[in-house]
Amino acid sequence: MYTYLIVDDEMIERKGIRMLLSRMNIRENILEASNGEEALEVFEKEKIDVLLTDINMPFMDGIELLSRVHEEYPGTETVIFSGYDEFSYAKKAISYGVSAY
């Protein structure tokens, strides 16, 4: 069984991603965090297989979160979902091994 972590400061966005996962018949262990700091706390307690994160969040943004996860939890599959379409974000995300943007 895989464990998924959805990270976004907007609850409606987290619910939307959860709904999309459900439509894809992914109903495994799905956890949530509202920012990067909370996400790292979840990583300390749980083995996360797939990280789905927004970029623009308070306290710790998604790019910094990706950097930390890449260093501290190698092998975690990562996916960014965001309204930002700037190449600089995608380039940074790719450097941290993001699976999809």
Question: Where would I find each of the regions flagged by the language model?
Answer:
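Two-component/phosphorelay signaling modules centered on CheY-like receiver
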Residues: 11-31
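Generic anion/oxyanion-binding catalytic loop in active/binding sites
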Residues: 6, 28, 79
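Non-catalytic signal-transmission and effector/linker regions of two-component phosphorelay proteins
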Residues: 1-3
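N-proximal short alpha-helices
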Residues: 6, 12, 16, 59, ...
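CheY-like receiver
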Residues: 40-101
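Conserved Asp/Asn-Gly motif in the active-site loop of CheY-like receiver
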Residues: 33-37
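Acidic di-acidic motifs
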Residues: 8-9, 54
